[in-house]
A protein has these predicted regions:
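Conserved catalytic-loop position in the HRD/HxD motif
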Residues: 269, 274-276
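Broad phosphate/nucleotide-binding scaffolds in NTP-utilizing and phosphate-metabolizing enzymes
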Residues: 1-262, 282-317, 321-440
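Helix-to-catalytic-loop junction in kinase catalytic cores
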Residues: 265-266
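Short, highly charged C-terminal tails/helix-capping segments
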Residues: 278-280
Length: 440
């Protein structure tokens, strides 16, 4: 027992030293560069910390990633770097459960085209395969003992967060709360049944939107073997394949991407929080049927549903106010309904006297006016967080996920569209025009 405690203390001390060293090194360099009039980018610090954490335990990077998204500490560029950083990581053959792969073939006639993974994330491994009808499938497998690794790392970071409560400035970040808020999100990424359910929900919600494709999942396999997820292979063009295409073509894809996100948030009550370029395939169909329009010329394939949320109808209406009234029309008449929906401490907000409540509302409006003229950026959440912190408020976990999805989708959208705000405005205008939004 004593040895276990000593081991944990040593690991925690080592982790603190690594992060502290990188911070000191970065700010020393920043100070020197300031006098030399040389720009210093914080992304360099993020990269260095990520590489050092990976050397200790790649799971640290995943939790570091989740914490930064939750508190809006990073720019969209920095966030997307972390997302892509964890897309393809090194693996060891000891992490592969070959016995389970044998059972998959024996019980369900799913054969792997190669037992070498085509991709490896922090949580799982991905293989190409074929089902009994020779249809191409993707097989996702959880790494051996990954849940225990997450639990160990999480406990260590909780100890560190308790220490951080006594460090000036850092204590204001409420790291312990951030860790506990994100524990469920991280664990859900290791629950393939939840991902199966998410894929089925998205497929059902978008059944009338033929421009979007989702993989068919083999639910019965995951129900028997919870560490496996087998789905249809819907591989299409990747971003690198369309990057140099004509801007008008990329603009069509940008429109579809934003339509997917806005429809999900405001109409279908489903939010995909990880909509970066690695999770989207592109389709160009030159044989569309103009009579029944069953197949659209341009389409998107969406994968990886490990981080999703499903807003209730009341919150959905608040998000409609955020996107349509405030962002699109600059109308703040329903701002109080929005604020009430995204505040965690609702009873405290309701107990405010009229003067204090109006002061909070006015400060929030000033922040929104300043930051919603163009596309929604990280700066909006940084500024709005300052207003919330002033009144001891926190964003709801759901709103944090919504903002994560906006950050990631907007960063990707800028790679597709020359004018993202114009594209988003066109989507909202079209949805309003054809009455495809539900007014609650």
């Amino acid at each position: 027992m004593i040895l276990d405690v000593m081991f944990i203390v040593m690991r925690i001390t080592n982790l603190l030293l690594i992060v502290s060293y990188e911070f000191v090194k970065f700010y020393c360099k920043k100070s020197i560069n300031y006098f030399c009039n040389i720009p210093t980018y914080r992304l360099e610090l993020i990269k260095n910390i990520s590489k050092k954490l990976e050397q200790e335990n790649i799971v640290y990077v995943k939790i570091f990633q989740a914490l930064c998204f939750d508190k809006d500490l990073l720019s969209s560029e920095e966030q997307c770097y972390l997302l892509k950083y964890t897309d393809n990581v090194p693996y060891d053959t000891s992490e592969i459960d070959y016995d389970l792969l044998d059972k998959l073939e024996h019980d369900f006639s799913i054969t792997l085209t190669n037992r070498t993974p085509i991709n490896c994330g922090i949580v799982g491994l991905v293989f190409d395969g074929l089902d009994s009808s020779n249809n191409k499938v993707i097989v996702k497998m959880l790494k051996k003992d990954i849940l225990q690794k997450f639990t160990d790392v999480f406990d260590e970071l909780l100890y560190i967060s308790y220490i951080c409560k006594y460090i000036p400035y850092i204590k204001s970040l409420k790291i312990t709360k951030m860790l506990l808020d994100n524990e469920e999100i991280l664990l859900n990424q290791m629950d393939f049944i939840k991902e199966v359910e998410a894929i089925e929900i998205f497929t059902k919600k978008y059944k009338n939107n033929k421009e979007y494709k989702f993989p068919r999942v083999y639910r019965e396999i995951t129900e028997k073997y919870g560490n496996l997820l087998v789905m249809e292979n819907i591989t299409g063009l990747q971003f690198k394949d369309i990057e140099l295409l004509d801007e008008t073509v990329k603009e069509e894809f940008a429109y579809l991407l934003n339509k997917f996100a806005i429809l999900g948030t405001l109409f279908h009550s489903v939010i995909h929080c990880d909509l970066h370029s690695g999770n989207v395939f592109f389709y160009i169909n030159n044989e569309t049927n103009s009579i029944n329009n069953e197949v659209s010329k341009y389409g998107l394939g969406i994968i990886d549903f490990g981080i999703c949320c499903f807003p209730n109808k009341k919150n959905q209406n608040a998000y409609y106010i955020f996107f349509n009234d405030i962002h699109y029309k600059q109308d703040y008449s329903n701002i109080e309904e929005l604020l009430y929906a995204i505040i965690e401490e609702k009873e405290v907000f309701s107990s405010f006297n009229i003067i204090k409540k109006q002061q909070f509302i006015n400060e929030s409006i000033d922040c929104l006016i300043l930051n919603t003229k163009d596309e929604i950026t990280t700066q909006l959440l940084i500024d709005l967080s300052k207003v919330f912190n002033k009144y001891d408020f926190n964003f709801t976990e759901e709103f944090n996920k919504l903002i994560l999805s906006i950050h990631v989708a907007n960063h990707f959208g800028k790679q597709l569209s020359i004018n993202l705000k114009a594209t988003q405005t066109r989507v909202l205008a079209d949805l309003n025009k054809f009455n495809e939004l539900v007014f609650i």
